[in-house]
Amino acid sequence: MRISSKVPNSGPLPAALGIGPMAARLEAAGFDGLWCSDHIVMPAVAESYYPFGDDGKVSWDPQMPWYDAVVAMTMTAAATARAEVGVAVLVLPLRQPVTFAKQVASIDALTGGRMALGVGAGWLAEEFEALGVDYATRGARLDEWMALLRDCWTGFPAARDGAHYTLP
């Protein structure tokens, strides 16, 4: 059995203790995987149903810092030697897919294959609105982005004129 832990990339701990030192301690404690979470924008007010709470209402402090997931993964990878590094669920439709494919492939190559990735369509409509992405298209974007990521990672990113992304 493999056991993983979340490396905090939100709240006061990352700035106080450092993501790298926390990751190193977790790896030394025997964890096999180290995962962070992902949000780009946390709105002060959200009406979206929060799927991780008992009452469906958001419970975060809008002033709480959320550090970028790719940066957190990179710091975690740099501070460890053995543990798998990843994002529990990255909101892929909010990312530029070719840039993100390169970032993840770079982390994977530079860690000797320790990168893992969980992706999802996202649940926070206000985050999509803040970033100018149509929330209603998140599922279609996820499908399109995943196909493009796979093509980039296998070395054959064919030109495409997708519904949401064009690759010349």
Model-derived regions, located:
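Internal, glycine-rich beta/alpha segment that forms the wall or movable "lid"
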Residues: A44-V45, D55-S59, T74, A83, ...
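N-terminal beta1-alpha1-beta2 module of alpha/beta enzyme domains
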Residues: M1-A79
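Short beta-strands and strand-loop turn motifs
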Residues: S4-K6, V85-A88
